[in-house]
């Protein structure tokens, strides 16, 4: 009895195995046997005498007896002081010494203090602000295994001890004892004696850490033996205890009852709180000894009745009220204690049913609910303010059931309520001790209510009230402990009352929306993890509910022995049903949540989406933690729902977007876990990978850490595996030197025992004493072994409660579902759950593993779950979403895929992902394409294999239309090259990047230059330590980059792109503007130039090295190096003239001129070498004489004999340079001139090849030797004779010789441009540029002009730089002065203007090359400013429609520059440009058609549908006009002028052969303009209305007059009417029948045309009228049958022609107007209210419908009979009637030049310009068929409402 470590168990020995929980309560029976608290009785004083209990100071020193009378008299005072004492500052846990009062002596003072206050020796928090309090427990050192964060249902097994908690935040201050803290395991939390905090009302997270599972079994056994030797007979002892307890109960009830005859309510006295607490202690004691059911029922009934009266006395009072006093508070506390006592009786198992009176239970629930509301108001001021107006109604019954959205208005409204309350949160330390005590008691009450659910089935009303009250706690802050109890209670209800599960889920989903925004995502639930992660309380509740949805089988609830498992018959499908129940819970919850999301829009939908995202993030945080197996199925069900109609297949775009985001987040987590498992091949994965025997070949390393740690290894005696003790969480003292078995073998043998047990028919005790006689070990799979290790861990760290049982059961349900053969092993699964009950040797089920190892096991097992296996399904659906029509969905899907890729970049190597991502490279949205590239680009550096796979598709994006996409593609390829020095596609990558050096966007050009600067020209860090060879001074890295440059040039078609790179690298002009403004660093410039010089030197060395190879191979190998050197010389020849030896390059390369190779490669090599020498010569002062002579001879020889003229050209130029440098004058040049001149005179044109070569060389010698000839005075050479010779050869019949003569003439004109001003030369040039000239002659003439302009431009540059030339050569003769902008003031401008019209005419030639050369001439002319830019605008606009992409781009570039510099000029010629584009389009179409096919009216009408080439040409033309419109779209005035100029073409069209086709072309062009704002189509409708207002009435009157005039004429016959041939003298006629005679002009395709004063070209009217003689493809002009109707006379036909043309133009405009109104949803009111002078409305959206525009059914041929004329009139009248309302509002303003539409009344709108058939007019467009006589519906049916069609 005096043993300090005694457990105090005075019951039978059968109870000693389990232990009674002593936490937070005082047990009267065992109190004398327990040591006093570690807090000394003198309350922390340094010396005992310093504690002044009395007024006088204590005498003496040392310890005096505490049982003195004067001290005993102060017991009540001591009790009060202890109650109010704050011991939170004491280190109670680590107290080293035990006070002397811990001896076996029993003090009388102790009993007296307990009588005054049973909780005196329990420490409590004085206020919510204090720090957590800890118990002082000795055995903390042996606590090693973390516990399961659980709160489990009470077991109903009558053979097990029960532990009921009174006040959950108190700690009994008793050292050196082991407490059973099972009551304290809240749902899903981890708490331990060392970590559990006292109640903390602050809003911070509550601490839920590890729970010790150490039970000190040896100490318990010893105590049991000691006690058993002195204990009396158990039955006698039980009777004695029950008898004493009954007497105590009678005494308690007697004190509460007032003696009297009547037992009214008023005659019950109030019992002090302390007495009720003493009663509770006694109840807990008798209950823990499992003797409460032995108390007579009448005594218990009387007790419950007495306690019920105590509760009844406090009804209506509140623990927290403004008017509450101390008496009220005591009554409330007494009532709460009475509830505690009542529930302690009723919640006990096997109690008589007479005790469970519904009246008492309802009063308990109602009073508890009321006090919970008061406590919540006290702890959360915002809740108190929000609930105050309805304080008495908020939770009364189900009053709010009629309004399910009570307090569920918009989230913004809820935020305003909280914000406007302006209630400052009360400091937590203000909360009274009474409220704190009440809160603690309410937590105890909720725990007992959960126990009550297991022993008594409550009514539905009670259950619903409990649920509503418990769920309400989640709306309040600072009461996290109460919320934990509520979670446990709700879980118990959910498990036991399945009929209310739907209601619970509904309430939880409602709770999510009711939470104020300030309390959402408040993560106060601490996970049992060392990382201290938290989740929301609501998430924890959801997890608990899913756990509790799997009801435990009765065998696991009631079986006291393992044998009962075999005896109880259970449905083999029970596990499946449990899993289905969990799935149903998940489905119900997510369905409710997602339904709420789809029912809201706007801000509320955004907040609901945020709630869902927070839930998912919480679940992912708890995923794969061993205590939360339900997280996986919760997320799995969510994914299944999101993959179907509620997510990706929903019609709601927002729902699909949210589904994509959530699925991407979840899939990324799955992939991240999979990567973790694949990288860390720890032993659990090795054990669970395959389903083979557990036995494994032993290794030298630790099976767990695989050798990552150091230390002594333990060897398993069975499998010989090795383990570190630290890896298993074992200490050296715990390790047995013999017969040590690893966890794998232990679990394997355990499973074999369970299998054998399930097969046996033994009906004995049900427990196996050993694991012997085990056979067939191969039946156990590796996965089962690892699973059992997890189950053992959960059972070891679990409490006496059954939460760990639920968790283990849930795991078994999941595993049962995933194993196909498990249906035959149901009892085996039950046995695994009850392994400890079956196997008596508890050591066989003890888990040795640390928590880290268990977490790894959980992760490994999770990878095999159906949830993890669903990753591929999620990924496939996300990839499918990349093909959605909506760009925002595609962008979100791409973002989701990118999150997955972030988790594992190797996903990009998946073929499915690669195809999907590459498909997004070609997405229609620029943002999606850029995002797809960004996805790949982020992982290029870290995963080179990804770059190789995607290189080809990324390279294609370098040509993307989006600037940002092109730039991103360039950066990605740059990263591929820099991150991988051995990148196999480096040369191809450089070639792709180099192709963008000519990009239209300057920023892209700068990026390309910067990229190559980083590749080649940037100085690398550090010093050069490695060189190409011993004799070389070239660094090795520079040699490598030079080779890269050589390889790149071999992949490019020409050197120009590389030349641009080198030029800009030398200038460093690609840096940002800020860097340019600060000035380029001269050091950087010098560094680049030095590297370029070294590259040239390296190239020269490579050329010398290749020279040693054979001749054939040498040419091929040396050519790339020479070409790169050529490129450097093109930029700056000074790079090849080193200061140490300027002639080095000339002397080194000169021997190559002796090559006899006659191949194209050899010719290219010679040409480049000659150019390099020619470039360097002007920079050299003097060459050695021998070198000069060799050069002259070699060049002369090649000029005479080389077969490639390009080499000859280079030789002539170089020879002239050598002659200038050598100072020999013109001697050698004149010699060659005489040689070729005499050869031409002697042979003439007999030998075409020799003559052509002579002409070519003669012209070149004159061009390049002009300065030498001029210096010598030309005494020995007759230039006039050469000109005459060239003219003579121009008159030959051989076209090749004529072209060569024209080329030679061009060479002379370049040297002597003044000759072009002579009349005969001018005629030659005009003739060769004429339409009818031969194509080769036109091409050569243009080439001559182009070379002349380039040469003039070059001379201007050389003259400017002549002062800096090393050796200036005097220029003689006639130098052509060219100054940009000088225009006509110099000879160059005069020459260009002389032939400008001819050059512009060639811009529209049907030959592609001729157009391209002409356009280049225009570019040079505009650059030099030689002509007025307005003259070429129409031609450039026409070339925007060129089928050749190069011509399109150059024309567009020139137009862009012109629009920036001369916007007025540009806009004034847009209309003419449109007409020119139409002429050009017709020219191109006709050239490709049949040669003899005439241009027919019907053919041109059906041009879009009949001729594929014509259709593509027209489409190209309209696209070109659209590009032009985009240039001016930003300026309102400019775009309005453009549209007005086109609409005016319909105002007064002049009849010619192609006028109708042109009007249709204009109509389609206007219809397809890329409008971006409503102002644009509105202005076009406005312009159309103006034309209609002026012309429609007159045209109708003229047509009607013609009909009345000829009404007497009759028609007969029904054949096809054909018109007479139009007389040949018919000329162009306008609408006023004036005949126009225009000068004739021949166009390029041979037809006579007419040019008006504006330069517009029209076809001759006679050609057009002739074309109309063909009708329906049959030429039947002169054949007329007798049945044909009377034809129109010539005079009538002339009049009808003008009016019908005007009618056709108006009908086209009406059709365009109708199309605009339907496409852009423009109604009548909007069109009529529009005014072009009104300011634009910013942000006005433009809605556009996809409607095709078709003019194929519009009749545009002329009427040939009066019947046709009547039909045309009727069609025109119908079209006018349908559009009457739109344009008649302008009738009142006809006289105004610029009518301004204004809002008028409907009556005003009825005023019409024509009066006939007004009764048929209506205000809508019903029955719009357009073609009155035909009656057929149009192909486009604008079946919208009338208000939307105007």
UniProtKB/Swiss-Prot annotation:
Disulfide pairings: none
Pfam families in alphabetical order: Cohesin_HEAT, Nipped-B_C, PHD
Keyword Zinc-finger belongs to the record: yes
Recorded GO CC terms: chromosome, centromeric region; nucleus
Residue numbers spanned by region Disordered: 175-234, 390-414, 1790-1846
Extent of Basic and acidic residues compositional bias: 175-184
Compositionally biased spans, kind Acidic residues: 1811-1820
Subcellular locations according to the entry: Nucleus; Chromosome, Centromere
InterPro entries: ARM-like, ARM-type_fold, Cohesin_HEAT, Nipped-B_C, Scc2/Nipped-B, Zinc_finger_PHD-type_CS, Znf_FYVE_PHD, Znf_PHD
BP GO annotations: cell division; centromere complex assembly; chromatin looping; chromosome segregation; embryo development ending in seed dormancy; meiotic cell cycle; meiotic sister chromatid cohesion; regulation of gene expression
Zinc finger residue ranges, PHD-type: 699-748
Polar residues composition bias: residue spans: 185-194, 1837-1846
Coiled coil is among the record's keywords: no
Disruption phenotype: Defective embryo arrested at preglobular/early globular stage with the formation of giant endosperm nuclei. Suspensor overproliferation phenotype preceded by ectopic auxin maxima distribution. Reduced sister chromatid cohesion. In conditional RNAi plants, sterility, arising from several defects in meiotic chromosome organization (e.g. failure of homologous pairing, loss of sister-chromatid cohesion, mixed segregation of chromosomes and chromosome fragmentation) and leading to shrunken and inviable pollen grains, and degeneration of the embryo sac.
HEAT repeat boundaries on the chain: 243-282, 298-335, 438-460, 461-499, 532-572, 613-631, 632-672, 781-818, 869-906, 945-982, 984-1021, 1053-1097, 1113-1152, 1174-1213, 1227-1267, 1277-1314, 1427-1464, 1475-1512, 1533-1575
UniProt keyword terms in alphabetical order: Cell cycle, Cell division, Centromere, Chromosome, Chromosome partition, Meiosis, Metal-binding, Mitosis, Nucleus, Repeat, Zinc, Zinc-finger
GO molecular function: cohesin loader activity; zinc ion binding
Annotated Basic residues bias: 1790-1805
Main subcellular location: nucleus
Organ and tissue specificity: Expressed in leaves, inflorescence and siliques.
Family: Belongs to the SCC2/Nipped-B family.
Assembly, per entry: Interacts with SCC4 to form the cohesin loading complex.
Annotated function: Essential protein required for cell fate determination during embryogenesis. Involved in sister chromatid cohesion during meiosis and mitosis. Forms a complex with SCC4, which is required for the association of the cohesin complex with chromosomes. Plays a structural role in chromatin, especially in centromere organization, chromosomal axis formation, and distribution of the cohesin subunit SCC3 on chromosomes.
PANTHER family the record matches: NIPPED-B-LIKE PROTEIN (PTHR21704:SF18), NIPPED-B-LIKE PROTEIN DELANGIN SCC2-RELATED (PTHR21704)
Protein name from the UniProt record: Sister chromatid cohesion protein SCC2
Gene: SCC2
């Amino acid at each position: 009895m005096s043993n300090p470590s005694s457990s105090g168990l005075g019951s039978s020995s059968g109870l000693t195995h389990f232990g009674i929980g002593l936490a937070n309560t005082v047990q009267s029976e065992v109190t004398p046997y327990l040591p006093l608290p570690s807090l000394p009785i003198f309350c922390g004083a340094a010396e005992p005498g310093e504690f002044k209990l009395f007024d006088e100071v204590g005498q003496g020193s040392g310890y005096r007896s505490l049982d003195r009378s004067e001290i005993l008299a102060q017991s009540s005072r001591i009790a009060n002081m202890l109650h109010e004492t704050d011991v939170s500052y004491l280190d109670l846990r680590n107290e080293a010494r035990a006070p002397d009062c811990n001896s076996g002596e029993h003090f009388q003072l102790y009993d007296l203090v307990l009588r005054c206050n049973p909780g005196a020796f329990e420490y409590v928090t004085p206020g919510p602000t204090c720090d957590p309090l800890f118990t002082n427990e000795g055995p903390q050192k042996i606590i090693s295994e973390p516990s399961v964060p659980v709160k489990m249902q009470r077991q109903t097994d009558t053979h097990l001890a029960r532990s009921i908690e009174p006040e959950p935040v108190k700690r009994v201050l008793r050292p050196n004892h082991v407490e059973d803290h099972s009551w304290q395991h809240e749902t899903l939390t981890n708490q331990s004696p060392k970590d559990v905090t006292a109640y903390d009302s602050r809003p911070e997270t509550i601490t839920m850490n590890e729970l010790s599972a150490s039970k000190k079994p040896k100490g318990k056994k010893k105590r049991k033996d000691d006690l058993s030797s002195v204990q009396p007979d158990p039955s006698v002892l039980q009777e004695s205890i029950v008898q004493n307890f009954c007497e105590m109960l009678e005494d308690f009830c007697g004190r509460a009852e007032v003696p009297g005859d009547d037992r009214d309510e008023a005659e019950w006295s109030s019992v002090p709180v302390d007495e009720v607490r003493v009663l509770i202690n006694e109840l807990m004691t008798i209950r823990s000894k499992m003797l409460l059911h032995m108390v007579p029922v009448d005594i218990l009934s009387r007790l419950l009745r007495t306690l019920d009266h105590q509760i009844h006395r406090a009804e209506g009072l509140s623990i927290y009220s403004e008017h509450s006093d101390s008496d009220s508070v005591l009554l409330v506390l007494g009532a709460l204690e009475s509830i505690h006592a009542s529930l302690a009786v009723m919640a006990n198992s096997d109690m008589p049913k007479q005790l469970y009176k519904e009246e008492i239970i309802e009063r308990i629930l109602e009073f508890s609910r009321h006090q919970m509301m008061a406590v919540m108001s006290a702890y959360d001021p915002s809740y108190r303010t929000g609930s105050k107006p309805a304080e008495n109604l908020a939770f009364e019954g189900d009053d709010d059931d009629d309004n399910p959205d009570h307090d569920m208005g918009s989230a913004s409204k809820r935020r305003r309520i909280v914000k406007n309350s302006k209630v400052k949160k009360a400091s937590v330390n203000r909360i009274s001790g009474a409220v704190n005590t009440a809160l603690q008691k309410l937590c105890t009450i909720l725990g007992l209510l959960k126990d009550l659910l297991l022993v008594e089935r409550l009514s539905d009303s009670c259950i619903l009230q409990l649920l509503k009250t418990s769920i309400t706690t989640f709306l309040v802050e600072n009461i996290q402990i109460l919320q934990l109890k509520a979670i446990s209670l709700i879980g118990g209800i959910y498990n036991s009352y399945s009929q209310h599960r739907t209601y619970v889920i509904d309430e939880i989903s409602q709770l999510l929306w009711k939470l104020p925004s300030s309390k959402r995502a408040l993560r106060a639930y601490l996970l049992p993890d060392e990382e201290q992660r938290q989740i929301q309380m609501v998430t924890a509740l959801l997890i608990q509910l899913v756990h509790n949805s799997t009801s435990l089988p009765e065998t696991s609830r009631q079986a006291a022995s393992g044998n009962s498992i075999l005896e109880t018959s259970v449905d083999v499908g029970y596990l499946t049903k449990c899993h289905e129940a969990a799935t149903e819970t998940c489905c119900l919850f997510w369905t409710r949540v997602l339904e709420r999301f789809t029912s809201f829009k706007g801000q509320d939908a955004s907040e609901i989406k945020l709630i869902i995202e927070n839930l998912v993030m919480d679940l992912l945080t708890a995923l794969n933690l061993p205590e939360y197996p339900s997280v996986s199925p919760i997320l799995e069900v969510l994914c299944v729902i999101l993959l179907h109609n509620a997510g990706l297949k929903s019609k709601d775009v927002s729902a699909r977007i949210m589904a994509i985001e959530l699925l991407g987040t979840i899939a990324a987590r799955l992939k991240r876990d999979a990567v973790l498992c694949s990288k860390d091949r720890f032993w659990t994965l090795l054990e669970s990978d395959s389903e083979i025997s557990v036995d494994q070949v032993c290794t030298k390393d630790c099976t767990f850490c695989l050798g990552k740690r150091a230390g002594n290894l333990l060897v398993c005696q069975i499998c010989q595996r090795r383990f570190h003790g630290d890896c298993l969480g074992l200490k050296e003292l715990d390790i047995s030197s013999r017969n040590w078995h690893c966890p794998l073998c232990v679990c394997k043998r355990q499973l074999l025992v369970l299998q054998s047990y399930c097969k046996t028919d033994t009906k004995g005790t049900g427990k196996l004493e050993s694991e012997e006689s085990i056979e067939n070990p191969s039946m156990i799979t590796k996965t089962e072994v690892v699973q059992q290790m997890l189950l053992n861990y959960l059972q070891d760290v679990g409490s006496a409660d059954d939460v760990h049982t639920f968790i283990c059961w849930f795991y078994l349900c999941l595993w049962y579902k995933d194993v196909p053969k498990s249906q035959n092993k149901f009892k085996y699964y039950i046995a695994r759950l009850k392994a400890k009950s079956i196997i008596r040797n508890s050591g066989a089920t003890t888990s040795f593993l640390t928590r880290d190892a268990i977490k790894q096991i959980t992760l490994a097992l999770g990878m095999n779950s159906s949830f993890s296996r669903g990753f591929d399904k999620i990924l496939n659906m996300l990839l499918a979403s990349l093909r959605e029509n909506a760009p925002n969905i595609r962008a979100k899907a791409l973002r989701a895929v990118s999150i997955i890729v972030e988790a594992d970049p190797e996903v990009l190597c998946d073929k499915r992902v690669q195809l999907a991502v590459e498909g997004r490279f070609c997405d229609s949205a620029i943002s999606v394409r850029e995002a797809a590239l960004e996805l790949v680009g982020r992982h290029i550096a870290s995963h080179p294999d990804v770059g190789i796979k995607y290189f080809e598709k990324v390279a294609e994006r370098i040509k993307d239309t989006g600037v940002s996409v092109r730039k991103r593609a360039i950066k990605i390829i740059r990263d591929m090259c820099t991150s991988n020095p051995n990148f196999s596609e480096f040369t191809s990558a450089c070639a792709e990047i180099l192709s963008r050096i000519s990009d239209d966007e300057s920023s892209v050009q700068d990026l390309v230059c910067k990229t190559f600067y980083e590749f080649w020209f940037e100085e690398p860090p550090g010093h050069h330590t490695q060189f190409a060879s011993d004799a070389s001074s070239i660094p090795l890295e520079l040699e490598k980059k030079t080779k890269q440059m050589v390889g790149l040039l071999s992949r490019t078609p020409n050197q120009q792109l590389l030349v641009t790179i080198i030029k800009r690298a030398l200038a460093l002009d690609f840096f940002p503007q800020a860097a340019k403004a600060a000035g380029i660093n001269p050091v950087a410039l010098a560094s680049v130039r030095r590297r370029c010089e070294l590259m040239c030197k390296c190239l020269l060395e490579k050329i010398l090295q290749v020279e040693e190879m054979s001749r054939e191979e040498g040419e091929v190998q040396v050519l790339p190096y020479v070409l790169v050197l050529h490129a450097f010389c093109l930029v700056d020849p000074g790079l090849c003239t080193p200061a140490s030896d300027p002639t080095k390059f000339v002397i080194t390369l000169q021997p190559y001129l002796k090559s006899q190779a006659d191949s194209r490669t050899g010719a290219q090599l010679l040409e480049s070498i000659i150019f390099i020498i020619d470039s360097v010569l002007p920079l050299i002062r003097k060459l050695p004489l021998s070198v000069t002579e060799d050069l002259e001879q070699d060049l002369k020889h090649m000029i005479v004999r080389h077969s490639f003229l390009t080499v000859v050209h280079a030789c002539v130029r170089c020879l002239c340079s050598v002659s200038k440098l050598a100072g020999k004058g013109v001697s050698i040049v004149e010699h060659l001139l005489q040689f070729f001149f005499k050869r031409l005179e002697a042979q003439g044109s007999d030998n075409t090849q020799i003559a052509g070569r002579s002409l070519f060389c003669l012209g070149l010698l004159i061009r390049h030797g002009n300065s030498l000839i001029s210096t010598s005075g030309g005494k020995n050479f007759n230039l006039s004779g050469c000109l005459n010779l060239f003219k003579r050869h121009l008159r030959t019949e051989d076209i090749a010789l004529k072209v060569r003569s024209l080329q030679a003439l061009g060479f002379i004109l370049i040297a002597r441009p003044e000759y072009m001003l002579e009349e005969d030369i001018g005629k030659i040039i005009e003739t060769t540029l004429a339409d009818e000239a031969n194509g080769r002659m036109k091409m050569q003439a243009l080439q001559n002009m182009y070379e002349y302009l380039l040469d003039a431009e070059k001379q201007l540059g050389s003259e400017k730089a002549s002062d800096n030339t090393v050796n200036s050569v005097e220029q003689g003769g006639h130098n052509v002065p060219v100054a940009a902008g000088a225009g006509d003031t110099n000879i160059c401008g005069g020459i260009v203007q002389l032939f400008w019209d001819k050059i512009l005419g060639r811009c529209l030639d049907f030959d592609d090359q001729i157009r391209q050369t002409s356009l280049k001439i225009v570019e040079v002319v505009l650059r030099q400013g030689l002509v007025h830019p307005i003259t070429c605008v129409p031609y450039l606009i026409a070339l925007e429609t060129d089928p050749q992409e190069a011509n399109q781009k150059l024309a567009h570039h020139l137009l862009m520059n012109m629009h920036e510099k001369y916007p007025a000029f540009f806009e004034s010629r847009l209309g003419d440009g449109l007409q020119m584009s139409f002429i050009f389009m017709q020219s191109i179409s006709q050239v490709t058609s049949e040669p003899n096919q005439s241009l027919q009216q019907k053919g041109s009408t059906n041009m879009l549908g009949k001729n594929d080439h014509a259709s593509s040409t027209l489409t190209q033309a309209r696209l070109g006009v659209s590009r032009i419109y985009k240039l001016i779209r930003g300026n309102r005035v400019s775009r309005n002028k453009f549209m007005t100029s086109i609409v005016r073409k319909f105002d007064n069209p002049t009849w010619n052969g192609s006028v109708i086709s042109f009007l249709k072309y204009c109509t389609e062009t206007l219809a397809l303009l890329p409008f971006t704002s409503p102002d644009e189509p509105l202005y076009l409708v406005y312009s159309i209305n103006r034309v209609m207002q002026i012309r429609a009435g007159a045209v109708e009157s003229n047509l009607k007059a013609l009909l009345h005039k000829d009404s007497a004429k009759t028609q007969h016959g029904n054949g096809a009417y054909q018109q007479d041939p139009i007389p040949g003298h018919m000329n162009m006629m306008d609408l006023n029948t004036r005949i126009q005679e225009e000068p004739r002009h021949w166009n390029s395709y041979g037809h006579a045309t007419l040019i008006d004063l504006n330069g517009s070209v029209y076809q001759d009217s006679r050609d057009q009228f002739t074309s109309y003689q063909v009708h329906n493809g049959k030429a039947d002009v002169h054949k007329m049958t007798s049945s044909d109707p009377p034809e129109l006379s010539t005079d009538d036909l002339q009049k009808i022609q003008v009016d019908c043309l005007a009618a056709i133009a108006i009908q086209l405009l009406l059709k365009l107007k109708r199309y605009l109104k339907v496409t852009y949803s423009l109604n009548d009111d909007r069109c009529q209210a529009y005014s072009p002078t009104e300011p634009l409305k910013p942000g006005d959206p433009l809605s556009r419908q996809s409607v095709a525009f078709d003019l194929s059914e519009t009749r545009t041929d002329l009427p040939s009979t009066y019947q046709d004329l009547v039909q045309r009139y009727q069609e025109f009248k119908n079209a006018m009637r349908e559009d009457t309302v739109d344009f008649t509002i302008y009738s009142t303003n006809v006289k105004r030049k610029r009518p301004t539409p204004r809002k008028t009344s409907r009556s005003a709108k009825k005023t019409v310009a024509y009066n006939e058939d007004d009764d048929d007019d209506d205000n809508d467009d019903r029955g719009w068929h357009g073609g009155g006589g035909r009656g057929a519906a149009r192909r486009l049916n604008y079946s919208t409402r009338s208000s939307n069609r105007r």
